[in-house]
């Protein structure tokens, strides 16, 4: 239940479009709805500004569809991460308006286009990092941010990064997705005066240990202003960057 939904409910009660009894039935599901296999947090948007997001991995198609359908009843935007085509097909049967972002593996449905303010830059070291970057970029857009995508600017050809610095510096936060040794986050952090959210990716050869090498490199960065999220966690990076960007306009 987001603030817009709650205000509309109050207005409907005041205008006698809904009875007090019906309103009580709606409000009794606050702060959460028990679905037995999940307890849906109806207060998430009121507390944090964003509704609950469905992590689809490990859930059945039916569970995902049930959860997203329930969230849709009380929120203007609903999204699910780490979703498959099969997950999307199940959701679309309930919510025909739903979209699927294949590379980002995100399902999203919205009643209206977000009023986007400010911008977030999303950059990658290589093309192989793009799926993680797209999870970040699409999430940031759904959450109401303009996004600049700057891909394949890793340290093996550092001049490519320098060529895009003006665009990166216009953003209020930058998300850096890099695998292998993860050096791009440190380099970027030493060149900009905005927060850097580093995302280690699982891309690389054997000794990269599926992103562990990049994670440790980013955690040990000597550049200031860098925060690090979990391996391949584009969603977490976008959520943090969105809070930073949103704070500029509230």
Language-model features and meaning:
Residues 1-84, 88, 94, 98:
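Long amphipathic alpha-helical segments
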Residues 53-54, 78, 119-125, 174-176, ...:
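Short glycine-rich or small-residue beta-strand-to-loop segments that form or flank ligand, phosphate
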Residues 62-64, 129-134, 158-159, 178-187, ...:
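Short glycine/serine/threonine-rich phosphate/pyrophosphate-binding segments
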Residues 104-108, 146-167, 212-213, 229:
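Glycine-rich oxoanion-binding loops at beta->alpha junctions
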Residues 117-159:
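Glycine-rich phosphate/diphosphate-binding loop of Rossmann-like nucleotide-binding domains
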Residues 124, 128, 166-169, 173, ...:
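C-terminal binding/interaction regions
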Residues 163-201:
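Glycine-rich phosphate-binding loop
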């Amino acid at each position: 239940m987001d603030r817009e939904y709650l205000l509309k409910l109050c207005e409907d009660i005041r205008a006698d479009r809904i009875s007090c009894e019906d309103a009580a039935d709606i409000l009794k599901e606050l702060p959460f709805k028990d679905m037995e296999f999940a307890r849906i947090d109806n207060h998430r948007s009121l507390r944090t500004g964003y509704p609950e997001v469905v992590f689809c991995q490990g859930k059945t198609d039916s569970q995902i569809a049930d959860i997203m359908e329930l969230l849709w009843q009380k929120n203007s935007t609903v999204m699910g991460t780490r979703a498959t085509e099969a997950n999307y097909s199940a959701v679309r049967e309930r919510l025909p308006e739903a979209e699927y972002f294949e590379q980002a593996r995100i399902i999203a449905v919205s009643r209206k286009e977000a009023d986007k303010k400010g911008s977030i830059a999303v950059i990658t070291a290589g093309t192989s990092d793009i799926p993680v970057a797209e999870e970040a970029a699409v999430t940031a857009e759904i959450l109401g941010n303009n996004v600049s995508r700057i891909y394949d600017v890793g340290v093996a050809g550092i001049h490519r990064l320098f060529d895009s610095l003006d665009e990166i510096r216009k953003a209020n936060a930058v998300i850096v997705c890099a695998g292998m040794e993860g050096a791009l986050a440190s380099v970027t952090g030493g060149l900009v005066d905005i927060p850097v959210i580093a995302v280690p990716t699982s891309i690389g050869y054997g000794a990269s240990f599926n992103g562990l090498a990049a994670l440790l490199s980013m955690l040990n960065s000597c550049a200031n202003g860098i925060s690090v999220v979990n391996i391949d966690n584009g969603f977490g990076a976008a959520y943090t960057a969105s809070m930073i960007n949103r704070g500029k306009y509230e």
